[in-house]
UniProtKB/Swiss-Prot annotation:
Residue stretches of biased makeup (Basic and acidic residues): 105-144, 296-311, 319-334
Protein's job: Component of the 90S pre-ribosome involved in the maturation of rRNAs. Required for early cleavages of the pre-RNAs in the 40S ribosomal subunit maturation pathway.
The UniProt record lists the keyword Transmembrane helix: no
GO-annotated cellular components: 90S preribosome; nucleolus
Basic residues: compositionally biased ranges: 146-157
Protein name according to UniProt: rRNA biogenesis protein rrp36
Source organism (scientific name): Penicillium rubens (strain ATCC 28089 / DSM 1075 / NRRL 1951 / Wisconsin 54-1255) (Penicillium chrysogenum)
Recorded coiled-coil stretches: 119-152, 216-276
InterPro entries named in the record: RRP36
Pfam families xref list: RRP36
């Protein structure tokens, strides 16, 4: 049995302090410690066919070999006994002990093959990944800030507006420039005649179409003749409305013409005074002064009877306007506090 103990001692790998075993080796070591504790240093030489009992024998043999190293070296034995003991020890070795030794050797070789280059390479890869992650986060934060940032206002309203050049090019392209479509040109709304504002303030616009006033006057005479001849009341009312509208148009056109004449004369007079050196700055008419001069010109163009009728109409118009603006009161001597008559009298205007 001394040879078997010696073989087990040589096959068994002595664990190092910094060696890391696998789970299987750890479980084997735990079972070995438990068996040593139960045996309390006793030596068992029984043989079993099961793997669990073989593991127990191996642990017992290991402990026995460690305890009797000095005894084996001191006792001389014969060659015949050595051969028998060697065969017996080979038969006593279990598969669990062999697997345990193989696992410990594999772990040791794997640890030896591990070089610092792998550690440096893995650390370099980790650093690169960390930097890429940080750069990606910074880019996302910058994009979010740029979206939330408000548009910068211009330094002044006359400064050019800033527009982004990152715009998608449209797929629609104009290969050949087509000639513009012909448009109808109405001289009544032409800028050369009506002025750039389009409100008929051009000085030559009225002169170019002065003949239209003659047409309107002739149309007005025709409508009056039709109203005089017709006997249908509905048709007569309709013609009367048309005549009234045309008269209003002619009257407004004449008033505009008078205003333009008054303005032209005033400007001409002011320019003459400035040219003579009597005035340094021109005087611009107020609207009230302009209307007053227009009325004077209007009444000056009328005859005596027509002027009297016009003045009478204007007097009645102004009187009715003033009467509407006057306050009202109830008739009766004893009125209520709110001004109402006790017997429901009519209201009258204050004189």
């Amino acid at each position: 049995m001394a040879i078997s103990d010696l073989l087990n001692r040589r096959v068994r790998a002595r664990p190092e302090d910094d060696e890391v075993y696998s789970e299987a080796s750890g479980s084997d070591e735990g079972s070995q410690d438990g068996s040593d504790a139960e045996s309390n240093g006793s030596i068992h030489s029984q043989e079993d066919d099961s793997d669990a009992e073989g593991d127990g024998d191996d642990t017992d043999a290991d402990s026995q070999s460690e305890a009797s190293n000095s005894d084996i070296e001191e006792e001389p034995e014969s060659e015949h006994d050595d051969g028998d003991d060697f065969k017996a020890s080979l038969a006593d070795i279990s598969f669990g002990a062999l697997a345990k030794a193989q696992a410990s050797m594999r772990e040791k070789n794997r640890k030896d093959k591990r070089t610092p280059k792998d550690d440096t390479a893995s650390s370099t890869v980790d650093d690169i990944r960390t930097k890429l992650r940080e750069a990606r986060e910074q880019k996302l934060e910058a994009a979010a800030k740029s979206k939330s940032k408000e548009k910068k206002s211009r330094s002044s309203k006359h400064a050019p507006m800033e527009l982004s050049s990152k715009r998608a090019v449209t797929r629609k392209r104009t290969a050949v420039e087509l000639p513009p479509a012909p448009r109808s040109r109405d001289p009544r709304f032409d800028a050369a005649v009506m002025g750039h504002s389009g409100v008929g303030k051009h000085p030559h616009g009225g002169k170019a179409y002065a003949f239209l006033d003659e047409y309107r006057a002739s149309e007005l005479n025709d409508l009056k003749e039709q109203m005089r001849k017709t006997k249908n009341l509905q048709q007569k009312e309709k013609l009367k409305g048309e005549i009234r509208r045309m008269q209003d148009k002619l009257r407004s056109a004449q008033n505009k013409k008078r205003e333009a004449e008054v303005q032209a004369e005033h400007k001409k007079r002011e320019k003459q005074l400035i040219r003579e050196g009597k005035k340094a700055n021109p005087y611009y008419l107020k609207n009230s002064e302009l209307q007053k001069q227009v009325l004077e010109r209007k009444y000056g163009e009328m005859g005596s009877r027509e002027r009297a009728k016009a003045l009478e109409r204007r007097r009645r118009k102004m009187a009715s306007k003033e009467r509407k603006e006057m306050p009202w009161e109830r008739r009766g001597a004893g009125g209520d506090e709110d001004g109402g008559a006790p017997n429901g009298g009519k209201r009258r205007r204050l004189e």
